[in-house]
Structures are given as structure tokens and as C-alpha cells.
Regions:
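Beta-propeller blade termini and top-face loops
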Residues: 1-177
Length: 177
């Protein structure tokens, strides 16, 4: 077995996001860097991997997030953690996956575990990295650390409560905040 990769096989689904805007529209990410899209509930799938930069095509897709506001918009984060790549990779599509724009330009050089869009405000995004949570209020153009007493720990999941404006952060070893 490859000592760097271990014995975990590739082609494992790591993340699934169903569009809240359109029935049957699903985004799927895998541990071998592929992002898949179906518009008919799984009848036909399109591999979108070649629409991303070469450098992320072999990385783990850590999260796909279907927009709460537009069926053509989605967000994808990749992590290079298992490859010891300490860069942030977050992308947005506004054309149903035809093209992807990096929105990670001013995030710190840390693997990204999760990206979430606020369900009430399309311009507000959150990312959880290996060390922190960051927020953007301009659709990913600029990012700032969230702060608010959060521990310096890997944020593995984020949830925006649907009825209250609370962000829940699931961390590695530091509980839920």
C-alpha cells in the first residue's frame, strides 16, 4: 500500500447537496477530486472535474453547498490536508457548474473543510478551515476571521439555524459552538 495515502480507496462520496430551489438537482463531491451534478434526481450524472483547476482535481472535495437563493449557484471546497497541502480552495459557480471562480484569494493558507451560504442573505458565506471560521459579507470577494471567542480548532461543519440567525460550528475536539 502507498504509505502516503494509506489503504483507504478512492471514489468515495464525501459530500452531497440537494438544491433547495429545484427538485432533483444534486451536487456530489468525492475523495478523488470529482464534482458530479445531476438535474434529474440521479438518472444522468455530469462529471464537472475538468472545469476546475488542475491543482485541485486530485484533492478531497470537502463540501458542496447548493445555493439557497439561485438554482444555478453552488459552492465547492477542496482540502489538501491528507496530501499535506496547506492552501485554501473554495469555488463558486453561477452558471450551473459550467465554470467555477475561486473565491479563496484572501483566506489564510489552511485546508478548507466546509463552506456554507446564509439561507437568508445570498451575499453572506462562511468557511470552516483547519484552524478557524471565516465570514464573507460580499459573496466571497473578501474574508475575515469570525472570532467571537471560538477556539483555534478545525471546524468540520457549519450550520446556520433555519429559524434563528445562529451559526453552529462543529469542531475537532472542542465541541459545538
Amino acid at each position: 500500500a502507498d504509505k502516503k495515502r494509506g489503504d483507504v480507496p478512492h471514489c468515495t462520496i464525501t459530500t452531497i447537496a440537494e438544491s433547495p430551489r429545484r427538485e432533483g438537482l444534486l451536487w456530489v463531491g468525492t475523495d478523488d477530486g470529482k464534482v458530479w451534478l445531476t438535474k434529474d434526481g440521479g438518472g444522468r450524472w455530469t462529471d464537472l472535474a475538468d472545469r476546475f483547476p488542475e491543482e485541485v482535481r486530485r484533492l478531497w472535495v470537502s463540501r458542496v453547498e447548493a445555493s439557497h437563493h439561485d438554482e444555478q449557484t453552488a459552492f465547492v471546497s477542496f482540502t489538501g490536508y491528507r496530501e499535506d497541502i496547506r492552501s485554501a480552495y473554495v469555488f463558486r459557480t453561477d452558471d450551473g457548474g459550467e465554470s467555477w471562480l475561486s473565491i479563496a484569494h484572501d483566506l489564510p493558507a489552511e485546508p478548507v473543510n466546509v463552506v456554507r451560504q446564509h439561507p437568508r442573505n445570498a451575499n453572506v458565506l462562511f468557511v470552516g478551515t483547519e484552524m478557524d471560521v471565516h465570514v464573507s459579507i460580499d459573496d466571497g470577494a473578501h474574508w475575515a476571521p469570525l472570532g467571537d471567542g471560538l477556539p483555534r480548532a478545525a471546524a468540520h461543519d457549519l450550520l446556520i439555524h433555519p429559524r434563528h440567525p445562529h451559526l453552529l460550528v462543529g469542531t475537532h475536539g472542542r465541541g459545538i459552538w
